[in-house]
């Protein structure tokens, strides 16, 4: 059975490309994102599940902006203004760049023969080898495809522009449905549990991660959600971002590193592109480059 080249679903699309021409096999998640420049002067509460489109406004210049309060995840109001056309165009370009930079070139999936009843054929295995001196693997990537306002998308995200000429009420807490003009930049975190560590994260990349959900869930969870569920209610919000330094450093924690948790959307989709219910192992690109896994006996036999 051959690999499925493309899969289109309501959570995200994906494309598999076999190795060839000196490049490795590749699995790309294609997420269609509708970014909406939020109109702060219009009354609106984010309601992403009811099909309504948020109010939008783009001004030609600063004299034409509208102003008003926009609430963050905690329900706190922040003074905001509408976007200016050139600002909005620049934000969209940088959004795509930063999300892809944050996620790409980290996740590799290596095939194994654990699933003996549904293992890859020799011809399929060959499609995962771009150089016999390297173990077979699939490089994973995300491709953000921006769609027009009101267009069909996998993710609908409002983007508020903070009014930086007005005093701000602390830090606007974004979430997967609502970002700000600051979300394409790195955010730094410091925690007393790890006083010598600075955690850095591209906010928009983290929030897009929540959209890499399964068909039966509304969002992709933070890295330590299962552990957080075992903690007292008051501690859960903090704990879900990671109760160890390693977990906290993950993309779906407070950092930028892809772990086996972040690899799950690609892993579950690769199962559908192939016909193995098991047989894929996550390896981080940095670990692969530092200590290349051993080439399997099967690969040595296919490429003597």
Region spans (language model):
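Active-site scaffold of zinc-dependent metalloenzymes
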Residues: 26-42, 53-81, 153-198, 248-254
């Amino acid at each position: 059975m051959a690999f499925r080249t493309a899969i289109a679903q309501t959570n995200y699309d994906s494309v598999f490309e076999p190795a060839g021409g000196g490049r490795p096999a590749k699995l790309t998640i294609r997420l269609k994102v509708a970014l909406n420049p939020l109109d702060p002067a219009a009354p609106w509460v984010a309601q992403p599940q009811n099909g309504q489109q948020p109010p939008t406004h783009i001004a030609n210049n600063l004299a034409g902006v509208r102003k008003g309060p926009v609430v963050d995840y905690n329900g706190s109001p922040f003074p905001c203004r509408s976007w200016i056309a050139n600002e909005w165009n620049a934000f969209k370009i940088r959004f795509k760049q930063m999300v892809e930079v944050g996620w790409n070139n980290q996740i590799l999936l290596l095939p194994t023969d654990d699933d003996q009843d549904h293992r890859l054929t020799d011809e399929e295995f060959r499609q995962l080898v771009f150089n016999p001196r390297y173990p077979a693997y699939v490089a994973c990537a995300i491709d953000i495809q921006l769609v027009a306002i009101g267009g069909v998308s996998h993710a609908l995200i409002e983007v508020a522009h903070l009014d930086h000429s007005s005093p701000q009420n602390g830090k606007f807490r974004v979430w997967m449905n609502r970002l700000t003009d600051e979300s394409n930049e790195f955010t730094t975190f410091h925690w007393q549990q790890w006083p010598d560590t600075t955690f850095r994260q591209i906010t928009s990349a983290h929030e897009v991660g929540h959209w890499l959900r399964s068909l039966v869930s509304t969002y992709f969870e933070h890295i330590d959600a299962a552990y957080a569920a075992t903690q007292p209610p008051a501690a859960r919000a903090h704990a879900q971002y990671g109760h160890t330094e390693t977990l906290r450093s993950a993309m779906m924690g407070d950092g930028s590193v892809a772990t086996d948790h972040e690899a799950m959307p690609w892993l579950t989709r690769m199962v559908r592109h192939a016909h193995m219910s098991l047989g894929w192992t996550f390896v981080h690109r940095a670990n692969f480059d530092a200590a290349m896994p051993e080439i399997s006996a099967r690969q040595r036999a296919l490429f003597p």
